[in-house]
C-alpha cells in the first residue's frame, strides 16, 4: 500500500477532557485507485485527512507513506516527505491573484531546486493533462470555478506525489462541473498511479469512485469497499 493509516486515534483538548476525533481508524489506500471517504460533518473526515497528510500527529497508531513510518521521522523529514510524496487539494483553490495558471504551479515546486525551464515544462504538461493547455497564461479572475479547481489539482501534482489527498473539491461547483472534476481525478489517479483519498459529504458521484469508506463519530463505519452504483 502506498498509504496506510493503521489503528489511529486522535484526540483534541475539550474543556477539562479530550474530544475523540478519530477512534482506532484503519484505512489502506492502494496506488492507482480513488478511495472516497464520506460521512456527515463532524464524523472525522477532515481529521483523517490531516493525519494522512502528516499535518497532525495522532495519539496512537501508525501512518505509513510510500513505505516510510512517519512516527520515525523528524519534523524536517516529515516536511520533506510532504513535499516529495504527498499532494494536497484543498476545498478552496486559494490561488494567488497576481500569478498565471502556470506560475501557480511553478511557485509551489520552486523549493525542489529544479531548473526554472524544467518547472515550466512540467507546469504546461500538467495544465494540458487537466484540460487547461490554453489557459496557462490566464490569471485566477479569468478562470471559472471549475477551471480554478483544475489548476488546484495540477498544482498538487507538480512534485509527482505518490499520495493525493483531496478535500471536498466539488463543494463550490454545480453538479455538472463537480462531476467533471471527479472524472478528472479518477483519470489522473489511474494514469499516474497515485493513492488518492477524496473526502466528501456528497453522495451524488459515488459511482465514479473505485472504493468508498463511510465515517461516523470518528470511526470507519464501513469500508473501504467497492463503490456502489448510484442510480439517477
Where are the regions a protein language model picked out?
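Short coil-to-helix segment of the ABC ATPase nucleotide-binding domain corresponding to the Q-loop/switch region
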Residues: 99-108
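Catalytic Walker B motif of ABC-type/P-loop ATPase nucleotide-binding domains
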Residues: 164-167
Amino acid at each position: 500500500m502506498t498509504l496506510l493509516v493503521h489503528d489511529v486515534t486522535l484526540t483534541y483538548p475539550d474543556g477539562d477532557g479530550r474530544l475523540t476525533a478519530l477512534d482506532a481508524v484503519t484505512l489502506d489506500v492502494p496506488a492507482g485507485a480513488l478511495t472516497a471517504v464520506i460521512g456527515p460533518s463532524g464524523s472525522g473526515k477532515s481529521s483523517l485527512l490531516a493525519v494522512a497528510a502528516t499535518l497532525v500527529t495522532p495519539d496512537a497508531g501508525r501512518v505509513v507513506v510510500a513505505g516510510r513510518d512517519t512516527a520515525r521521522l523528524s519534523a524536517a523529514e516529515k516536511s520533506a516527505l510532504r513535499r516529495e510524496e504527498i499532494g494536497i487539494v484543498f476545498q478552496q483553490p486559494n490561488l494567488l491573484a497576481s500569478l498565471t495558471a502556470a506560475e501557480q504551479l511553478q511557485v509551489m515546486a520552486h523549493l525542489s531546486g529544479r531548473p526554472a525551464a524544467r518547472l515550466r515544462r512540467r507546469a504546461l504538461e500538467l495544465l494540458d493533462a487537466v484540460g487547461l493547455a490554453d489557459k496557462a497564461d490566464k490569471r485566477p479572475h479569468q478562470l471559472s470555478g471549475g477551471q480554478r479547481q483544475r489548476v488546484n489539482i495540477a498544482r498538487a501534482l507538480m512534485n509527482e506525489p505518490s499520495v493525493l489527498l483531496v478535500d471536498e473539491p466539488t463543494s463550490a461547483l454545480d453538479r455538472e462541473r463537480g462531476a467533471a472534476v471527479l472524472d478528472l481525478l479518477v483519470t489522473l489517479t489511474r494514469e499516474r498511479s497515485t493513492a488518492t483519498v477524496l473526502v466528501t459529504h456528497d453522495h451524488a458521484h459515488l459511482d465514479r469512485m473505485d472504493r468508498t469508506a463511510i465515517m461516523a463519530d470518528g470511526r470507519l463505519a464501513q469500508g473501504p469497499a467497492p463503490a456502489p452504483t448510484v442510480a439517477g
